[in-house]
């Protein structure tokens, strides 16, 4: 599904841990790294596409994550001319993306890059929050910078929030 301007609707996913680090995934059989992302199918909402891509690419389900934020607007990047498939119609010149910031609430061991017969990634690691902006392929860099700027205050607040106090068991609470 390509829009009238030649952009493919897509979702991007930033997964953070409790320390404010983000998951950085290595493209299968390549030396390039990126955040999970993928196309939105006809009739699918961005949130539905995000959960589908989350499972397909990194093996996580709704129970493994919590949505912290999503971008206010669609963000676009153009593909370099050498990557545009000029022989397909309609021609896709880039991606327009809705991004989601997720907190991993399960253990790292739930991450599984092998849920598909054609995996997108073959490795991953936790990296500092701003690291991806400097390391992603150049044509995605502006979108990554905008995404990370928009999500930064949420991640900072999340990191600085004190842990929720555990309530005492009912038998230990004072009465009266």
From Swiss-Prot:
Keywords: Hydrolase. GO terms for biological process: mRNA catabolic process. Residues 6-149 form the Nudix hydrolase domain. Accelerates the degradation of transcripts by removing pyrophosphate from the 5'-end of triphosphorylated RNA, leading to a more labile monophosphorylated state that can stimulate subsequent ribonuclease cleavage. Pfam families: NUDIX. A motif (Nudix box) lies at residues 38-59. This is RNA pyrophosphohydrolase. It comes from the Bacteria.
């Amino acid at each position: 599904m390509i829009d009238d301007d030649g952009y493919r609707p897509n979702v991007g996913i930033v997964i953070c841990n409790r320390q404010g680090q983000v998951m950085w995934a290595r493209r299968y059989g390549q030396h390039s790294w990126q955040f999970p992302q993928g196309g939105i199918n006809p009739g699918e909402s961005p949130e539905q596409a995000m959960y589908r891509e989350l499972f397909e690419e990194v093996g996580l389900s709704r129970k493994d994550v919590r949505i912290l934020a999503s971008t206010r607007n669609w963000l676009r990047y153009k593909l370099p001319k050498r990557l545009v498939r000029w022989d397909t119609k309609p021609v896709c010149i880039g991606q327009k993306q809705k991004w989601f910031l997720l907190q991993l609430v399960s253990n790292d061991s739930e991450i599984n890059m092998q849920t598909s017969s054609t995996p997108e990634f073959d490795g991953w690691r936790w990296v500092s929050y701003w690291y991806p902006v400097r390391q992603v392929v150049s044509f995605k860099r502006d979108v990554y910078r905008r995404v990370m700027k928009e999500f930064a205050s949420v991640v900072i607040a999340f990191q600085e929030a004190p842990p929720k106090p555990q309530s005492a068991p009912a038998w230990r609470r004072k009465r009266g």
